[in-house]
Amino acid sequence: IAEDIYDLTNLPKKGNPFTYDAFLAAGENNNAKLIAAYFNQNGLEAKYIHPKDAGIFVTSEPCNARILPSSYDKIEELRNHNEILVIPGFFGITKEGQVCTFSRGGSDITGSIIAAGVKADLYENFTDVNGIFAAHPGIIKNPHSIPELTYKEMRELAYAGFSVLHDEALVPAYRGKIPLVIKNTNNPNHPGTRIVLEHSNDHVTVVAVSYTHLRAHETD
């Protein structure tokens, strides 16, 4: 880790649009190494895997990278591992070998990409709330968490201002037809919100209400 941090100081300060991304990605990358080491020290067989080795190759768009479709064949090979795999989120590698970060919520995007690549049965995304609330808790007192949403409803809410999960993080899991569950790291026994292709209950009417600049958005 110390060597990696030192290497950052040798990157060109001017003329390289990827230098900023390399610094942004360093924290996530080094945390993944520490977590893998912690697991191993506590008797859990774990392995740190760099995004390059995982096959997460992206477009050359600093701070706005997008996964290359050809990456998924390599990512699927992660299924061959038996260890706990610790893969840093938030960034991928360009074909030229440059670190390039995803947009805001990039770690969620990485999780969704990997879930789609390995054809996971479920993608669990842990955050600091009990799923998606039916209304903004800063405006409505004690709103209930929504047990189930469709991907379409979740994208509409994300676009309208619900910021628990970046809307771009929904796309890989949706295309892979993988259910996604948003759960609370500090309350893991709470069921959270499950995001699916279609509702199991056909009688759902209003799901949630949000607003942007005094314009109301209602999903059904």
Feature roles, as predicted:
Residues 56-63, 187-203:
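Self-splicing inteins and homing endonuclease
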Residues 1-170:
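Nucleotide/pyrophosphate-binding catalytic subdomain
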Residues 52, 90-91, 184-186, 199:
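A broadly conserved detector of short glycine/acidic/proline-rich loop/turn motifs that flank catalytic sites
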Residues 158, 166-194:
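A conserved active-site cap/scaffold subdomain adjacent to cofactor or substrate pockets
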Residues 127, 184, 218:
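Active-site proximal loops enriched in glycine and acidic residues that flank catalytic Cys/His/Asp
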Residues 212-220:
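Conserved small/polar residues in nucleotide/adenosyl-binding loops
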Residues 60-62, 137-138, 176, 180, ...:
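Charge-rich, low-complexity amphipathic helices
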Residues 205-211:
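Flexible hinge/switch segments at interdomain interfaces of large molecular machines
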